[in-house]
A protein has these predicted regions:
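Bacterial N-terminal signal peptides that target proteins for export
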Residues: 2-10
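Residue-level detector of conserved, function-critical positions
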Residues: 23-194
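Intrinsically disordered, low-complexity segments enriched in polar/charged small residues
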Residues: 9-12, 78
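Bacterial N-terminal signal peptides
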Residues: 11-21
Length: 194
């Protein structure tokens, strides 16, 4: 029964990996996934391609490894997010309330009571988006972020120095892909920008 549950979870993860890899075809590359998370009871096991457990931890929520780092949420009552390496060791401590995966060498993190900050893989602060309500991972050197203006969310794009490249004037937006991003104007009409 337990083996069937683990195989079912593994099948679901593998199916989602197929879909996830297909999304990366747009950028012309398929990412190799070296370790896959599966849950067994309260433990998250990271297994390799030979179905061998590399390490485990009590993590209720995890990510796949991206740029050799995975995001994990601790199981404590006041759960926090940190980043682990391929051996399961924390490379950045679990002190964040929210975080994104690393992409293009950077991730966004939020400490309790603070604004989103961009960090590198060493945990060094690159910049803070003081007015941002949300921020996504980098795509083509730009990250989509939102601010609240007169009760409404507005979306714009920031570069890796923290400078706004495209002002937050859109009522909806998507990340850049192949040099273009879908955006929605104030009238609700969608189009593309480059």
């Amino acid at each position: 029964m337990v083996a069937r549950k683990v195989k079912y979870c593994m099948g679901a993860v593998l199916a989602s990996l197929f879909v996830f890899s297909a999304c990366n075809l747009q950028s012309g590359r398929i990412e190799t996934v070296s370790l896959i998370p599966v849950w067994y009871g309260d433990s998250c096991l990271y297994i390799n391609a030979e179905d061998k457990v590399e390490f485990s931890g009590l993590y209720p929520s995890v990510s796949l490894f991206r740029e050799d780092i995975a995001l994990v949420q601790t199981a404590e009552r006041d759960a926090r997010i940190g980043f682990i390496d391929n051996s399961g060791e924390f490379v950045l401590p679990a002190v964040y309330k929210q975080a994104t995966i690393f992409r293009e060498g950077m991730a966004f993190v939020v400490r309790p009571g603070e604004a989103p900050c961009a960090i590198n893989q060493k945990g060094e602060l690159k910049f803070t988006l003081r007015d941002a309500e949300s921020v996504e991972t980098y795509h083509e050197d730009m990250a989509l972020y939102s601010v609240r203006e007169k009760g409404k969310l507005r979306y714009g794009y920031v570069d890796k120095r923290g400078e706004t490249i495209i002002d937050p004037v859109y009522s909806g937006a998507m990340s850049f892909s192949q040099g273009k991003a879908a955006v929605r104007d104030a009238k609700g009409k969608w189009g593309f920008i480059d």
